[in-house]
Structures are given as C-alpha cells and as structure tokens.
Amino acid sequence: MTEGHDMEGRNKFKPTRIFFLLAILLGVWTFFGLCCTDAAGSDANGLELRVMTFNIRYGTANDGDNAWDKRKDMVCGVLRQHEPDIVGLQEALRFQIDYIRAELPKYGEIGVAREDGYIKGEYSCILYRTDRFGVGESGTFWFSNTPAIPGSNTWGNACVRICSWARLIETKTGRAFYIFNLHLDHVSQPSREKSAVLLAERIKNRRYKEPYIVTGDFNSGENNPVIKYLKGEIAIEGSDGSSAKTQVPMIDTFRVLHPDVKYVRTAHEFKGTRQGNKIDYIFVPQGTKVLEAEILYDNVNGRYPSDHYPVTASFVLNVPF
C-alpha cells in the first residue's frame, strides 16, 4: 500500500517543476536575445546606425536675420527631433559647438579646429552619443602635402581644409567602426581631387579593417570627378601625380534609396530652394544595407536652421559578432 502510494506521488503533476523549467528556458532565451539584439538596434547581422551630416554655417557670418543667435535653437531642434547617433558638423566654430553640447549633453565631441589644431577656426567635428559609444582612437588630418601639420595648405585651397575621424566602439557589444568627417574646398577642383585621394588612402590604411562612414560637405555635385572617384567609377590624380581608382569604393546612401529624385540641392543660401546640386553626402562601403535616407527641409515659418539642409541616413553596417 505504501509502495503504491509512492509511485502515485512520483507520477503526480507538479506545477512548481514546470514553472522552474519555464523560468530556466526564459532566462536562456533572454540571454541569447540580449547577445543577438540590444536596445540600441544592433543584431547578429550588423550594427544599425542613424547618421547626420550638417553644415551649420559659421557663426560669425554677417547673415542678418539668419545670424547664428537667431537660428541656433533651430539647429538644436533638428538634432533633438531626428536623434542621430552620430553627427558630422561642418563650419562649426568653438562657441557654436559649445552651445550645441550644452543644449544636447548626450553628445560627446571629436575634432580640432583647422587653423591651429586646437580652437582657432572652423571644425569638422564629430558628435556621438556617449551613452552608446566609446572612442577607440581619433585624429585630424589636413588636406595638404603635410597632413599632420596643423594649418597646412599646399594644394591651392581657398581655405585650410581638414578631416576629423574616429574609431567608435559600441559599449554594449564591443563592435567598432570608423567615421570620417570633412569639408572640401569650395574653389579649387585640383585641391578637392587630391583631398579625395588622400581620404581614400587614409581609409584604406586604417588600423583595423572595420567598416567606415564618410560624412561631409564635399562642395562637389554628383557628376564631379571627386564623387565619381569615391564611388569607384573613375581614376583621378593624387598629390604624387599618379592616377588610379580608389581601393575603397563607396555608395551614396541617399541615391541607394532615391536614384531618380531630381531636386536634391543641399546648399540653399537660406532660400529653401531644392533644384540644384547635392554637395552634402553620407557614404558607406559597398554592400551596406541602407534603411532610410533623407534631405531634411525642417524650417520654422520659412526660416531655416542653416544655409545647408542636413542630410540623414539609417543603415546597417556589416559588423557581425
């Protein structure tokens, strides 16, 4: 009698055991889920990012009703509304950057001023979300025959021109990528072409062969040899006099999704015009999956935050675990 009772007890349904097993399974599922997907948008197939390039117009310009003090809150409003993970700024002066960072403290900053490698002159700085990324390495180089010398200008540029760059590391996953942000000369085509070649060389020779992003005001329309070179379509001449195609061909994120859009002007002189050349770009490596890409026409009653439209793109960089 006792033996039969014991057998019945062993076969009896025990809810606590089932709940215990379910808890274990849930924990395992959650663990692998966190490994493969985190809240920032990363998954096992790549790193999802939202990037903006934004020429904010230098703040000492005599722009009257479009002066910096009358539009600085619109600039910050654009960043708040669209919430990019990374922003490449051009024409930013120290006091402009300070204002933006005070209003949007979640962004860290990478870069130096072009005239002295410190604080004098315009920056092509990079803003990045400090809650998501750390900085592995960073620097700035000058578009000249002496790219390590601050203020150097040997290619006939109307202005000193620079590129600031960084290797950013996603804190949660340890996955990393490079970001290069630049502003090419607005006058000299030979300077722009030499600058594009130097940029491609720096990308090719980066320490870690991880994906890269290039943002900037290229002062070059889509049919300019500079853009065709970066896309791997043609060869152009570098500072050493030789000509070759780039070894790091890129894609224009905007054109991946909008190949036939005609009105793509990005520098509009505060007029809000859309017909003309696109000179602001976000480039990524060939094969990158582009999710969204826009030229932003944000304005307040016909008043614009800058004389350039900001450009944004969301994409998945191929940085698997």
At which residue positions do the language-model features occur?
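N-terminal, active-site-proximal structural segment of metallo-dependent hydrolase catalytic domains
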Residues: 3, 8-20, 29-103, 116-122, ...
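Extracellular/periplasmic catalytic domains that process cell-envelope and extracellular macromolecules
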Residues: 43-46, 81, 102, 117-120, ...
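Charged helix-capping and loop-helix junction motifs
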Residues: 193-199
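Structured beta-strand-rich core segments of catalytic domains in phosphoester-bond hydrolases
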Residues: 86-180
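Acidic/histidine-rich helix-loop elements
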Residues: 53-73, 142-159, 185
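Active-site beta-strand/loop signature of hydrolases that rely on acidic residues for catalysis
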Residues: 49-56, 75-100, 127, 166, ...
